[in-house]
Amino acid sequence: MIENLSGNQMLLGLIIGLAVLIFLVLKTKIHAFVALIIATVVIGVIGGMPLVKETFPDGKSLGIIMSITKGFGGTLSGIGIIIGFGVILGKIFEISGAAQRMAITFLNLFGKKREEEAMAITGFFVSIPIFCDSGFIVVSPIAKAIARTVKKSVIGIGAALAGGLVITHSMVPPTPGPLGVAGIFNVDVGQFILIGICMAIPMAIAVILYAKGYLRHKMPFINDEDGSLISIKEFDYNPNAVISLEEKDLPGVFTSFAPLVLPIILILINTVLSALKLKTGFYGVLIFLGQPIIAVGLGLLLAIVTQLRNVDRETALREMEKGMEQAGIILLVTGGGGALGQIIKDSGLGTYIAQGMAHANIPLILLPFLISTGVRFIQGSGTVAMITAAGITAPILAAAGTVNPIVGAFACCGGSLFFSYFNDSFFWVVNRLLGVTQTKDQFRTWSYTTTIAWAVAGAEVLIMNLFM
């Protein structure tokens, strides 16, 4: 601990600050970003940190405002532009029809009897540039049409789609939440993408097995013309549903996938070349192009050039500005999480907690996972849950030095998937669009699906912690 600061007093400040954060998010009209900053100030004040910058005898400077601004700016300096580019890219995917083209491509690739797999993979890719809610709204009509065409449960197909969406959204940058966590933990984005994809695959498989093995048989329903659920046995077969979708004016396969695949490939090339210490000549150019800001920017430019050819300038700019509005909220929340983490780091509270857990023989890797799980269950937002957990635990794990930062970051991301229910907007999007109205069925459709993904993520984090 910093001299003149009490570990127990700072810990009390943290507990009260988190209680204030949860109260403000749940019971007031105060936005999560403002609540994060208020909670950060409460932690510092109750913990005894100087209100303004103060220099101690050992030469260290400390102050609540200094820590807040340092944490906020430091977190966003590396990822702010990437988040902005990524959210705008997502808006382009929405209005261009690229997401629908992805869905149809995977349906054709997987063929009959593998509709759940096709929808899960579609969600897996679509969610990288597009938010879960928007992605499901855009692609769910295709899932419904597929269910009517093959006479399969729309619940199983829809849950597989939603599962693919939320898994990637929670685990793989450059989606905003994981990217924010990567920034707070200061881990390499390329490594985070590669490991995130590897972690997401078993999670998606588990969701597919649940959709095919349980939901398809226990909830054999299809949407009627008015959107309500009816038994498959009562439904009139319509073999032309998918054909009509394929005839829509959508961008081509290459045009749809290239703006998404290009940045990922460039970032991964950068990671590999940097690891091999190949940084001169042409390798240096590739490393430059593989910097996340440049790579995502190139993907955005490619999307503008190829996917907006049939969209008028006014519409394109208006939709991209909507994306910028969404980016603003994400940037503020992410920066707020960074400010929270900086208070914990600067005060020495992270070291204090790490030493206490070490003496108690409590596995440190459980801390970010359980905090993310708890915040998620209490207030509903997966992004807020993982950012809050990262802000609290990144300095603690760094002080301990026994947990790989990448593993800690994924623990924050995985914990945010726990039991989506009434306080999660995506819970309502999925169930309402699928026509599920009974609470028990809503839990079976979506809450259990996310909890399965959460359990697999937890197991993967524990295994990773043994080897990394």
Language model: regions and residue ranges:
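Hydrophobic transmembrane alpha-helices of multi-pass solute/ion transporters
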Residues: M1-I88, R101-T105, L109, L266-G336, ...
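Long, contiguous bundles of hydrophobic transmembrane helices that form the permeation core
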Residues: I2-L11, L194-E319, M468
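Hydrophobic core segments of alpha-helical transmembrane domains in multi-pass membrane transport
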Residues: G13-L26, I37-G47, I83-I88, G123-V126, ...
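Hydrophobic alpha-helical transmembrane segments of multi-pass integral membrane proteins
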Residues: G80-G86, L109-I142, L331-G337, A360-A400, ...
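Re-entrant/interfacial helical elements at transmembrane boundaries that shape
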Residues: V87, R101-I104, S134-I146, T175-F185, ...
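Juxtamembrane helix-boundary/capping and inter-helix hinge elements in multi-pass membrane proteins
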Residues: E94-A99, L109-K113, I146-I157, G183-G190, ...
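Alpha-helical transmembrane segments of multi-pass membrane proteins
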Residues: K112-S127, V150-S170, G190-I197, I201, ...
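Juxtamembrane and boundary regions of transmembrane helices in multi-pass small-molecule transporters
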Residues: V150, Q191-A241, G414-M468
